[in-house]
């Protein structure tokens, strides 16, 4: 593979001297390198293939980091990273100690704002621009925002404020008709109606350029012409929402035609009012398998590049187990409906959406709306299931409290990607849900350790008239244990016992049950036998039952796949210490820090939650429990 142009770049400034032919060749090289690395490491493929030309045009027109580009969500930043001095490390993408799959301010001065969640770029870019102007600094600020991101309320809040401020922010609307799943809602349909004919755009650009060359009167004439155009449009044409917000709207533009993009971007640089460039791109551009199936190639694991076949695991994942469980529930209870925020495939709702389209609601990237919408459904007698990644539920905490918990409504939250999340880093770890939700009255919190236990606990949740959160990791389901079929008793977990008399009890949440089991096996090989208590219920807890159980052991080690502060392990240890005498105990959980990207095993190891760490701590704890009264 010839990457001579890409490898010759020392930074984005080198792009400005390339000929049009070299620019087109560079775009192909960038695509090939993205395909090569993502096929090996996994990552966000389709979105990155769709913005190659746009990224090149941005760096040819603007001078970063003097000018600032903020990428919304940030998963489409691979070409940006390749062009800003990180091509030599690109093979480490999303790997431990390698470059992140998202913009990171501590990784490069070209990454102006760290992102990972959707719809933040407009607010961040507006803040950066305001600070630059307040400090008397020049430089343009550009926010690159996907059409899917504009389904979130935060984006509209920013649009309203930016348009009202009369700043010179440039917004690039990357319209690929997708967020992760295909876009839904009236705004997506609205974008498809916005068409401005090419000849009109070219005429407007040429006229503006010609007027600007006229001394003294050129720029005032441009402003007068713009006001006249807006007045005429108001009288003669249907309103444009972006123009109504106060933006100069330009588009739609072909997002894969670099020369046109550069011409319009250069024009936008000269404007002194907010400008929105509507750019249409093809998600997965240049790789037929991704163009034909952009949803499957949005976030993808390692795959066969020649055949477009993603590596599949034989074992069942927790997401798949949830999908089967939900379908079984829907077959027997017609009150069950499902809600997602633009994550149909990721949350396992694809099959449900096909079988029960009238009972499936994709609200777009709008977690706040999703939760309150579910609250409304629950008020009207149905059983809503909100399937959402743990990290994205953070975006709707007020709605969980105010609209669901205060009214004690029977909404089920299926929290996927809870605990350690592989490869996506700080913004995507699902570490805070337990601590956040434990503090909220009325909510039950469940942590299944296997596919069968997920099914049992989901059945329990459906029978409740209160909110229930069920959390599970992005991981394969472990083999079933005999104890997992134990009937559900509110507030009680399951004890997995050994034949030998045990002095050690390992208490864990479901997401780390495999690591705790492996640790128990390691201890057994040393002649130290440990029972395992899978808590099942983080909230409520049958305190009397738990205190009676733990009193049988000399030492108790609590292991939790959430943050220690405010978590269940810390709470159970405090409860244990009310017993006199109390067994010797300790807590292993995620510490007060953000955990970077790596495999799930690497993230757990970094937190001291790997099987070797657990076994070593349990052994140490037992050694220091000598003399404890049982």
From Swiss-Prot:
Domain of life: Bacteria
UniProt catalytic activity: D-glyceraldehyde 3-phosphate + pyruvate + H(+) = 1-deoxy-D-xylulose 5-phosphate + CO2
Keywords for this protein: Isoprene biosynthesis, Magnesium, Metal-binding, Thiamine biosynthesis, Thiamine pyrophosphate, Transferase
Any one GO MF annotation of this record: magnesium ion binding
A GO biological process held by the record: terpenoid biosynthetic process
Cellular component aspect of the GO annotation: cytosol
E.C. number: 2.2.1.7
Cofactor(s) listed: Mg(2+); thiamine diphosphate
Binding site for thiamine diphosphate: 75, 116-118, 148-149, 176, 287, 367
UniProt cross-references to HAMAP family, sorted A to Z: DXP_synth
Family assignment from sequence similarity: Belongs to the transketolase family. DXPS subfamily.
Subunit relationships: Homodimer.
Protein name as catalogued: 1-deoxy-D-xylulose-5-phosphate synthase
Origin species: Treponema pallidum (strain Nichols)
